Curated annotation (Swiss-Prot):
GO terms for cellular component: cytosolic large ribosomal subunit. Belongs to the universal ribosomal protein uL30 family. One of its GO terms (biological process) is translation. GO terms for molecular function: structural constituent of ribosome. It comes from Kosmotoga olearia (strain ATCC BAA-1733 / DSM 21960 / TBF 19.5.1). Keywords: Ribonucleoprotein, Ribosomal protein. InterPro entries: Ribo_uL30_ferredoxin-like_sf (IPR036919), Ribosomal_uL30_bac-type (IPR005996), Ribosomal_uL30_ferredoxin-like (IPR016082). This is Large ribosomal subunit protein uL30. Part of the 50S ribosomal subunit. Disulfide bonds: none annotated. It comes from the Bacteria. The lineage of its organism: Bacteria, Thermotogati, Thermotogota, Thermotogae, Kosmotogales.
Length: 62
């Protein structure tokens, strides 16, 4: 089975550049404490790595 990632926004994007805010929007995160679940893929991992300082990430089994 494919792994999934549970991603939670824990820090506000205020004060960060437009590209990082756009990455959060692409992940589906808008407000602090928002959580989303995505399939584990290289594309999602790359987006997470770009804004890892604002996120909390957990791997979950489906």
């Amino acid at each position: 089975m494919a792994k999934k990632l549970k991603i939670k926004l824990v820090k506000s994007p205020i004060g960060y550049n437009r590209r990082q805010r756009a990455t959060l929007k692409a992940l589906g995160l808008r407000k602090i404490s928002d959580e989303v679940v995505h399939d584990d893929s290289p594309q999602i991992r790359g987006m997470i790595n770009a804004v890892i300082h604002m996120l909390e990430v957990k791997e979950i089994e489906n």
